[in-house]
Amino acid sequence: MFSSRIWLLLAVTVGVCLAVPDLDEIKKNLRKHGPDYYKNQPKMNENTVRLLKVDYWFRTESMIYDDIDNKEKDPSTVIAGNFSFETLHHDVEGGMLGRFTLTQCNTDNCGNPSPIYIAFRQGGNNAEHILKASDESDATWNFLYAIVNTIYTPAEYGEGDEQTVDTIYGRCFVNFGRPEDKRFRRIIEKCDLGYGTNFTKFEGIESVQYDQDVWYTQNTKVDADIIMVDAIEMLAFKSPLHEKYGFTLESRTHVEITNRTRVFVTSYCNDTVPSAKCAEQAFGAVRVGGKLYEHVKIAQEQSNKLTKLIGTYRRHLQDMGDSHICEKHSLLYSQIAQEARLAKRQDWEAAIQYPENDHVLSLIASALGGVGTAESITTAREVLLTASPDYLDDLLFGISQSSSNNEKWHKQLMYWLGSLDKKSEEYWKVANTIATVLNKRCEASTSSLNSCNKGKETIVNKFITDLTAGGVEVRVLEVLENIPIFGSYTFAKKFICETESEDVQKAALNVILAASKNLYETQLTHKLIKLFRNTCSQETPTSHSQLAIDILLKCVPDHQNVATLILRTETLNPDDQEKWHYLYKAIEASGNKDELKAEFWSRMRKFKVFRPNFLHRALQADSHVHWQEIADASNFQLFSTANTEFLQKSFKRSIFELSMKKGRKEHNLFSLSIDTEHLEQFVTGSASSRSGAPQGSVRIGVAGHKLPTHHIFKGSTDLLSTVWEADGRTHKAFEGHVPVRDVRLSVPLLSGLTLDVDSVGAISMRVLASAEVSLWNQRSNAKAEAYTSGSLHLTASLYHHSEPVRHVESTISALSTFTTDTRAIFETLPYDFCLRTSNSNVDINQKTVVQDQIGKHKKKTLNRKRVHPGVTYRLDDSTIRQCNSYLEQFRL
């Protein structure tokens, strides 16, 4: 009882103390308004609350420019005027309801925005609910929403000063600094912009930087009001490929208090009513979102341009012909691929069934495949493949290059595969494509890759299980090469150094070679060493030994014992000179590519037992590995690797790969694998113990996807037919388009304007091949030309009240041709030949268009061009020796 009285007394004391009037405030009001000021005040009752109305003056300025040198000359958009902020309600949970209203416009471009209501959390200014007046039909971004977004933070209440959260711009880092000298600071940066399409195949080809810096000045004497706000906002799209590419946007906002009024009114809602609910009940406000402003219109409505762009591409193709490509091929395809995502089924039906589009159906099929939705698969099967089944390959290539990671799309692909006969060619083509699609699903993030490798991805497990259920086939392993995860690796490893056929073991080695070195373990390395040493139960072909070398060298230096096991096998009388020559060249190539590996092998050779000897220079062999850097600029390294095997002076197989590396991430751009069997009996005139029917096959890989193997000839009859048909005519070996950039986003600015940005990019490639064999002159000439076009295109449009203000376009394109020319003389056996590899001039064009959409509509166009001279690439020592021999024969 006594304690209860003490607590009651303390409560009364606190209440009395808190009720003591502010004498300084009373004296101030008496001096200002006279002695009758308090007599004339309305009588307050228990339903009367004290609220605030604060008047502010504001000014915002926005500008977009293509180059910093033009910043001072370019126009800007200014909005200035006055607005008021009113407090309307406080709830018991610490929430507060405020209203922002335009009171005056000084620049005649403010429009007529309706008041905005915001429910926020006191203490941290955390925005929770945004509401609009009921008489406003559509909520469209304007400067009132911008002011609200400037003052209130998207950070979560109570989660600290530094957070990475979802904002209206995307997922961003938000820092709300503690007060220093009456000033707070909010920084928003490191944003993953946009909630729509934001795809980049090669990280770093286009950099996007968004920064927001807001300073708040507080009045610490009277209720801690914000008396001044200064905000700076910057958005820049740039590319390391060209310093003039892109644009920069800046906006600045200044807000300053002009008046502060206390008002006493009857409370609008009971304090138990949440602030957002009070806005709806008392003011009829309608919610338009939370801190993400979900139902506020930001992006401008645009009609779909798919049909128009396809028509433009068709006319361009008619004017230019089909012999080569230009920068417009890749540019137009990238735009078509972007519009394809928003196209409806009737748009596709119209494009596919339009008679004049027959010669561009390959492009339409590729774009449809790249959409990556369940609806696109249905449209492709029911419309495209029903009317034009010959375009299955183009459709599948488009699917393989899609950036989509849609679960329903993956299931539709699996349903399609399940409906096909496993004995049909279509089944294996579709399976080969699905393997690449699911591999992208696994590589989407570190966690998803771990999930795939641990067998936790149901759809991936089902695909591999169904594919391998019918037993082992070479085609099964070729498909698994496109999805080299742990399940594929484990399946392939079972056939290494076992009793399976040579073709199966070779295909299994290719799967393991494609897999990550993180999957390799001691059991595998021991099997590979046995292959290399030719100590398996079956005799090991040289091809298998060389593939084993390629895999073992990937292990180094992670598995350091591998180097010891290899070098211990060295002798002065090697069993297979081609194998050992290939090993030494492969070690040299790996050292050229990676300095750490070069240092590792150098240290190994310093041991007395492993010191190099005359054997390295005395080998009479032509098999080799050649690594060559092509370009290194802007942190991108472009290089090629060529692996070639010879058997008894005759060509056996080769793998050429063109790759790009940025940081630790390596991308395969193009690969060409040529494989032959049993040709030595025709080339050298001698039959080996492995003699059989001659075979030749080719497999092309583009942007991480290996196409199905194409068999050139099987048997002597096919070989002879191929030779007779080699009359020098040019054939199209491959044509395809690879999207590399697809971004579409709308950015609401703190100045009240909005910015729509579209960024697209693609690489187009056309490979033409020709071969001529003259049995009379005993000469042959084979030529392959890869015409390559790449484009990156960016458009940025600044809008004010949905009206265009300024438009910037920036484009960069590159065009070049890669050529290989092989000539041979077969007057004597073994024949002599020479290979020449070259690259034509690299033409780089950059174009910028800046156009004002108001006033005189001034337009500025800038064209810039650079030409990098073509080069003929240095050959490996073995190839140089062969070329010298060829030239000697040619002179004779």
From Swiss-Prot:
GO molecular function, one term: lipid binding
Keyword annotations of the record: Endoplasmic reticulum, Lipid transport, Lipid-binding, Signal, Transport
Keyword Transport: yes
GO CC terms: basolateral plasma membrane; endoplasmic reticulum; Golgi apparatus
Signal peptide stretch: 1-19
InterPro entries listed in its UniProt record: MTP_lip-bd, MTTP
Subcellular location(s) of the protein: Endoplasmic reticulum
GO biological process terms, semicolon-separated: endoplasmic reticulum unfolded protein response; IRE1-mediated unfolded protein response; lipoprotein metabolic process; lipoprotein transport; plasma lipoprotein particle assembly
Transmembrane segments: none
Chief localization: endoplasmic reticulum
Effects seen without this gene: RNAi-mediated knockdown suppresses the slow germline development and the delayed egg-production of clk-1 mutants, but does not affect the rate of postembryonic development.
Subunit record text: Heterodimer; heterodimerizes with protein disulfide isomerase.
Task performed by this protein: Catalyzes the transport of cholesteryl ester, and phospholipid between phospholipid surfaces. Does not catalyze transport of triglycerides. Required for the assembly and secretion of plasma lipoproteins that contain apolipoprotein B. Required for normal expression of klf-3.
The name this protein goes by in its record: Microsomal triglyceride transfer protein homolog
Organism: Caenorhabditis elegans
Gene: dsc-4
